[in-house]
Design a protein with these regions (language model features):
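CBM-like, beta-strand-rich accessory domains located in the C-terminal region of large
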Residues: 10-201
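Catalytic-core region of carbohydrate-active enzymes that cleave or remodel glycosidic bonds
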Residues: 1-6
Length: 201
């Protein structure tokens, strides 16, 4: 089973190819101020082992650098994404999931349905059925439960000073939909932390 993947595209002559598949927001990354990445320069590999990868890149946007570490675990993986900027900006960490939630959202969180992400350009118009999750006051961690084939999964993430959104977005083929997690922060320097675990190993 596939949890997440790079979509490639639906054909270079397709409208959705240029409006979504080749756009920053369709990837598992951080979007700054609703804009596409402005640099396509390669990053720097800091370390690489059989179970981990640590890499960074400077000037993804003007005066913005990324560093990402991924560590495989015996029952899942840990993903850490650090963002640094010279000034306060709006950060959206987006993670697309080829799976469906396996939980009752209305009894677990306060939810605000038909929400807006505030952007319509650079692929944001393709996010549909947007729900804002409002965890209990003072919560520092959010746990979501998923079903992927015969597997039961849990994703946990740090949500201090974070707005949490869930949405549907096009997959490839575009008739399929993915579930997109969007973690929004306003900051100069922040680090996102997400861990995925298989519960029924």
């Amino acid at each position: 089973e596939t949890l997440t993947k790079d979509l490639s595209n639906s054909g270079y002559g397709s409208i959705i190819c240029n409006q979504w598949h080749r756009i920053t927001a369709s990837h598992n990354t951080v979007v700054i101020d609703g804009m596409n990445h402005t640099s396509v320069e390669p990053g720097i590999k800091l370390s690489f082992t059989n179970s981990s990868c640590d890499a960074k890149v400077e000037h993804v946007y003007e005066d913005v650098g990324f560093r990402r570490k991924i560590q495989l675990l015996s029952d899942g993986f840990y993903d850490e994404f650090e963002v640094k900027s010279g000034r306060e900006r709006n950060y959206d960490f987006i993670f697309h999931v080829e799976s469906d939630l396996d939980m009752n959202m209305d009894t677990t969180f306060e939810t605000s349905k038909n929400s807006s992400l505030g952007y319509t350009e650079n692929g944001y118009a393709y996010f549909k059925d947007i729900i804002k999750l409002i965890p209990l006051k003072g919560s520092e961690e959010l746990i979501l439960y998923w079903k992927l084939g015969g597997l039961k999964l849990a994703s946990s993430m740090n949500i201090i000073d974070t707005e949490v959104f869930l949405a549907k977005s096009p997959a490839n083929p575009v008739t399929d939909l993915r579930t997109s997690i969007i973690l929004r922060r306003k900051a100069k320097h922040t680090t996102y932390q997400m861990e995925w675990k298989i519960l029924n190993v």
